[in-house]
């Protein structure tokens, strides 16, 4: 006797891509990536080259934030403002380096995965997305565009 289970695999637009074609795609791609990160591994599409690059940003998060697992566990992800203030203690807004920008993305992706749901995002994993969007600006998107391509 076998069970027939139908599972939805989350497959965002940029997941299978190798690169971005326009700076205008960066914010959308990062939004999709954090959302994708909040799904269980078996419920999301395999990463293409572009998402593999984004996954490597977790290494930058380890360098900047040291123990990201403990940081992610202890941050108040139910409060976006408090989370951004904590991150700003590590990384001031003015003149962020490429490593610091990547670390913010890596930290938020780690949080989305850590707090994510089985087949859908949770409020904490969605707040990781909102924290990233709050922390990054157009200049940061330009810098990340160059690193992603």
Curated annotation (Swiss-Prot):
Gene3D superfamilies: dsDNA poxvirus (1.10.437.20). Signal peptide: none annotated. Keywords: Early protein, Host-virus interaction, Inhibition of host NF-kappa-B by virus. It holds the Pfam family Poxv_Bcl-2-like. The keyword Phosphoprotein does not apply. One of its GO terms (biological process) is symbiont-mediated suppression of host NF-kappaB cascade. It comes from the Viruses. InterPro entries: Poxvirus_B14/B22/C16, Poxvirus_Bcl-2-like, Poxvirus_sf. Contributes to virulence by binding to the host IKBKB subunit of the IKK complex and preventing host NF-kappa-B activation in response to pro-inflammatory stimuli such as TNF-alpha or IL1B. Mechanistically, sterically hinders the direct contact between the kinase domains of IKBKB in the IKK complex containing IKBKB, CHUK/IKKA and NEMO. Homodimers. Interacts with host IKBKB; this interaction inhibits host NF-kappa-B activation. Belongs to the orthopoxvirus OPG200 family. This is Protein OPG200. It comes from Vaccinia virus (strain Copenhagen).
